[in-house]
Each structure stands twice: as structure tokens, then as C-alpha cells.
């Protein structure tokens, strides 16, 4: 296994550690979650750069990298649902999960035909927006823990929710683009069923 793929696997390993830090209340657990999420996000930045610079792009990497991204960001959004149950994030998470399952299904259908669908620019932008909104929300949660409840904490959390909904919009748009670009995998399969 080459270095970029090892970084991707490392991101997968860091995901449950991040989720544990997010959900398990211990002193500065949001800081620990923020550090773990930041480190995992950096592996996403570096695995692709190293793979392209050194000519180490593989089909495994093209398939595993977006899957590792989905796992990391989904864990964060599910964690936020648990930590902020009244924040209306359930719908955001449902839209994100629907898009992720849909795109993963398209990738699996394509893989059956020997085609590996790499992440598109819209998909990469979606991932960046999701990661930024998650990082902001982790910082806002930690700030809220330090300064206590009040107008400032509420404002920080509302701004975080707005960022999450911006990421949701990008998620839905990129999902529609993926399905449209890969619609032949649906029509071909539908013809096979008839």
C-alpha cells in the first residue's frame, strides 16, 4: 500500500477516535475532537497531493478517499445531532446521508462495470464546505463550554448551523450533478430489469 492510501486509511482509523472525543464528555473534549478532525482533514489534503505529485494515483485511492471523507464528515454530523438535539440538524443530516448513499451507490454500480468514478470538483467543494462547517461548529461548542450559555454562545451556534446548511446546499447540488452525470448507470440497470 502506497503512502497516499496509508494516509486515507489513517483518516478512517481517526474517525472513531474523533467521534469518541466529540461525544464523551471530559475536560476539553471538544478541543480533542477539533485536533483529531483537523488532523484527519489534513490527511485528506495531503493524500491527493502526494498521489498526484508522485504518480501514485490508484483505483483503490480513487474509491477509498471519498469513502473516508464521507465516513469522517458523517460521523461529525451524527455527533452534532446527539450533542444538539433541538438544533434542527436532523434534516441536514438526512439530506447529507441521502446524497452520500446515492453517490456511493452510483460508484458501486460503476465499479461493477470496471469504472472508477473519482471525486468531482463539486464533490471536493462539498467536502471542503462540510469540513469547514464542522471545524467551526467544534470551535463554537468549545467556546460555549468555556464561556457558558448566553447570547454569544447562541450566536456562535446559530452561525455554525448556517454554515452547516450552506454545506448541505452544496451537498445536494453535487449529488444531483453526480446522478445526472452517471444517469446511464441507472437507465442501463433499469433496462436489464425489464
Which residues does each PLM region occupy?
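Hydrophobic alpha-helical transmembrane segments of integral membrane proteins
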Residues: 1, 9-13, 62-65
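Multi-pass alpha-helical membrane architecture of UbiA-family
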Residues: 4-7, 79
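Active-site His/Glu-centered metal-binding helix of metallohydrolases
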Residues: 13, 42-50, 67, 71, ...
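Membrane-embedded alpha-helical segments that form the functional core of polytopic membrane enzymes
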Residues: 14-60, 76-96, 155-172
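C-terminal membrane-associated helical module and adjoining short loops/tails
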Residues: 1-5, 14-15, 25, 34-41, ...
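C-terminal ends of transmembrane helices
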Residues: 48-53, 105-113, 176-182
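Core segments of transmembrane alpha-helices
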Residues: 10-17, 68-77, 103-104, 126-138
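Helix-adjacent hinge/juxtasegments
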Residues: 60-116
Amino acid at each position: 500500500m502506497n503512502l497516499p492510501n496509508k494516509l486515507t486509511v489513517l483518516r478512517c482509523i481517526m474517525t472513531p477516535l474523533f467521534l469518541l472525543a466529540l461525544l464523551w464528555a471530559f475536560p476539553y473534549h471538544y478541543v480533542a475532537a477539533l485536533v483529531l478532525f483537523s488532523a484527519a482533514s489534513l490527511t485528506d489534503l495531503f493524500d491527493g497531493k502526494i498521489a498526484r505529485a508522485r504518480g501514485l494515483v490508484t483505483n483503490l485511492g480513487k474509491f477509498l478517499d471519498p469513502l473516508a471523507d464521507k465516513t469522517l464528515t458523517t460521523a461529525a454530523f451524527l455527533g452534532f445531532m446527539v450533542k444538539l438535539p433541538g438544533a434542527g440538524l436532523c434534516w441536514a443530516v438526512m439530506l447529507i446521508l441521502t446524497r452520500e448513499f446515492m453517490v456511493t451507490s452510483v460508484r458501486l454500480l460503476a465499479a461493477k462495470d470496471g469504472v472508477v468514478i473519482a471525486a468531482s470538483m463539486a464533490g471536493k467543494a462539498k467536502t471542503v464546505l462540510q469540513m469547514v462547517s464542522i471545524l467551526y461548529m467544534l470551535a463554537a461548542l468549545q467556546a460555549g463550554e468555556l464561556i457558558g450559555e448566553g447570547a454569544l454562545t447562541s450566536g456562535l451556534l446559530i452561525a455554525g448551523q448556517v454554515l452547516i446548511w450552506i454545506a448541505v446546499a452544496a451537498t445536494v447540488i453535487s449529488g444531483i450533478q453526480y446522478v445526472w452525470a452517471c444517469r446511464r448507470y441507472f437507465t442501463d440497470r433499469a433496462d436489464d430489469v425489464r
